[in-house]
């Protein structure tokens, strides 16, 4: 089980400062979609250069032109790139093919997929590396989370690793860990904490204890 820090509402210098505080406790640093929109893939490049020991995920949420966008993110230094589960199989296949060429990983984000179980089965057959259940900001505001969906993909997915994102905090982490996802993605649960290093340290401890 690995811990991923999601960075969404920062610029590049702020991102670097934030990662410095918690780098010893995290395995993956995510350059979130808002950061990519504001800063471009330069953000991926600069974080990878600053923290070569960490895996960097580029949250591109690819919906089309899978191969091309994977190629560009790979050139910037991304280790893992996201594709949306709601896209068509051709886009996912193109992304997987290019990722294999570049020796990179694909994480499929199941945000807003209505039938998680049947779509996860289909995607699992396409050779992706991770399948991630994800409750976005707008639904988190309505009090929703992806904990039940995690159970569904844990029971369904046979080849890919499993991941969960959206609204995970220190007090809800034990519930997530019970399901044994391969990757736990935390954003505000760390970035909004008064003591980020202490929170990340406690989260990592819980994850290691598993």
From Swiss-Prot:
Assigned keywords, A-Z: Carbohydrate metabolism, Detoxification, Lyase, One-carbon metabolism
GO molecular function term, any single one: orotidine-5'-phosphate decarboxylase activity
Pfam families recorded: OMPdecase (PF00215)
Lyase listed as a keyword: yes
Coiled-coil residue windows: none
Induction: By formaldehyde, under the control of HxlR. Not induced by methanol, formate, or methylamine.
Similarity comment text for this entry: Belongs to the HPS/KGPDC family. HPS subfamily.
PANTHER family noted in UniProt: 3-KETO-L-GULONATE-6-PHOSPHATE DECARBOXYLASE SGBH-RELATED
NCBIfam families tied to this protein: RuMP_HxlA
Protein name from the UniProt record: 3-hexulose-6-phosphate synthase
Species this chain originates from: Bacillus subtilis (strain 168)
Organism lineage string: Bacteria, Bacillati, Bacillota, Bacilli, Bacillales
Gene: hxlA
């Amino acid at each position: 089980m690995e811990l991923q820090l999601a960075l969404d509402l920062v610029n590049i210098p702020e991102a670097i400062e934030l990662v410095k505080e918690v780098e010893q406790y995290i395995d993956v640093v995510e350059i979130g979609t808002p950061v990519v929109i504001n800063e471009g893939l330069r953000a991926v490049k600069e974080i990878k250069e600053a923290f070569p020991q960490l895996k960097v995920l580029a949250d591109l949420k690819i919906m089309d032109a899978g191969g091309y966008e994977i190629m560009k993110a790979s050139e910037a230094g991304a280790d893992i790139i996201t594709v949306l589960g709601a896209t068509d199989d051709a886009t996912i296949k193109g992304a997987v093919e290019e990722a294999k060429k570049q020796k990179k990983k694909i994480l499929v984000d199941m945000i807003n997929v209505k039938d998680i179980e049947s779509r996860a089965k289909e995607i699992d057959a396409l050779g992706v590396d991770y399948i991630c259940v994800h409750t976005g900001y707008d639904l988190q505001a309505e009090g929703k989370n992806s904990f039940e969906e995690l159970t569904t993909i844990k029971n369904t997915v046979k080849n890919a690793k499993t991941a969960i994102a959206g609204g995970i905090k220190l007090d809800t982490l034990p519930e997530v860990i019970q399901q044994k996802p391969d990757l736990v993605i935390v954003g505000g649960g760390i970035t909004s904490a008064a003591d980020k290093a202490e929170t990340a340290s406690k989260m990592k401890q819980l994850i290691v204890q598993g």
